[in-house]
C-alpha cells in the first residue's frame, strides 16, 4: 500500500494541471470573448465591450463631421422654340411576324466546392491544449493508486 503522501501528491498534481489547463484556455480566448463590459450599470443600458486598447472612455478617432453640400446654382430657363408643323407620315406595311426562336435549355449550375475549414487563430484554445492537462492529471492519479 502506498503511503498517504503519494495520494496527496497525486491529488495536488491533478488539481494543478487542471487549473493550469483551464487558465491557459481562458487566457487564449481573450477578454472580449467573455462578454466583459465597461459601464452599463443602469436598467436597460448596455455597456461597451472592453478591448485591449481601452482608452478610458475617450474616443481616439472621432468621426469627422460631414461638410455641408454647396447649393447648386439655378440654371437659366431656355426660351421656348416654335413647334414645326408635323409632316404626314406614310403608313408602313405590316411586317410578317418572325417565328419565335426556341429558348436554349439552361445549363445546370456546377456544384459549389465545399469551403475549406478555417485555420485556427494563433494562441486560440484547441482540443489539444485543453485535453492535455486532463490526460496528464489522470495519468498521475492512476500512477499514484
UniProtKB/Swiss-Prot annotation:
Keywords: Cell membrane, Glycoprotein, GPI-anchor, Lipoprotein, Membrane, Repeat, Signal
Coiled coil: none
Comp. bias intervals (Basic and acidic residues): 31-52
An annotated GO cellular component: side of membrane
Secreted recorded as keyword: no
Main location: membrane
Region listing for 32 X 2 AA tandem repeats of [DE]-P, in residue ranges: 59-122
Subcellular location: Cell membrane
Segments of skewed composition (Acidic residues): 60-120
Classification via InterPro entries: SDr-like (IPR050972), Trypano_PARP (IPR008882)
Position of the signal peptide: 1-27
Propeptide segments, given as residue ranges: 124-145
Keyword Hydrolase: no
UniProt region (Disordered), positions on chain: 28-127
Covalent lipid adducts (GPI-anchor amidated glycine), residues: 123
Sequence repeats: from-to residues: 59-60, 61-62, 63-64, 65-66, 67-68, 69-70, 71-72, 73-74, 75-76, 77-78, 79-80, 81-82, 83-84, 85-86, 87-88, 89-90, 91-92, 93-94, 95-96, 97-98, 99-100, 101-102, 103-104, 105-106, 107-108, 109-110, 111-112, 113-114, 115-116, 117-118, 119-120, 121-122
Membrane topology: Lipid-anchor; GPI-anchor
Function: Major surface antigen of procyclic forms.
Designated name of the protein: Procyclic form-specific polypeptide B-alpha
Top-level taxonomy: Eukaryota, Discoba, Euglenozoa, Kinetoplastea, Metakinetoplastina
Gene designation: PARPB
Amino acid at each position: 500500500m502506498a503511503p498517504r503522501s503519494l495520494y496527496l501528491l497525486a491529488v495536488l498534481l491533478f488539481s494543478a494541471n487542471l487549473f493550469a489547463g483551464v487558465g491557459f484556455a481562458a487566457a487564449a480566448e481573450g477578454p472580449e470573448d467573455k462578454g466583459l463590459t465597461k459601464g452599463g450599470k443602469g436598467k436597460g443600458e448596455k455597456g461597451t465591450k472592453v478591448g485591449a486598447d481601452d482608452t478610458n472612455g475617450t474616443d481616439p478617432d472621432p468621426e469627422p463631421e460631414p461638410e455641408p453640400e454647396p447649393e447648386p446654382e439655378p440654371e437659366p430657363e431656355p426660351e421656348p422654340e416654335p413647334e414645326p408643323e408635323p409632316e404626314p407620315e406614310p403608313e408602313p406595311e405590316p411586317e410578317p411576324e418572325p417565328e419565335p426562336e426556341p429558348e436554349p435549355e439552361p445549363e445546370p449550375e456546377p456544384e459549389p466546392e465545399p469551403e475549406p475549414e478555417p485555420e485556427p487563430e494563433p494562441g486560440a484554445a484547441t482540443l489539444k491544449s485543453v485535453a492535455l492537462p486532463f490526460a496528464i492529471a489522470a495519468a498521475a492519479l492512476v500512477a499514484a493508486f
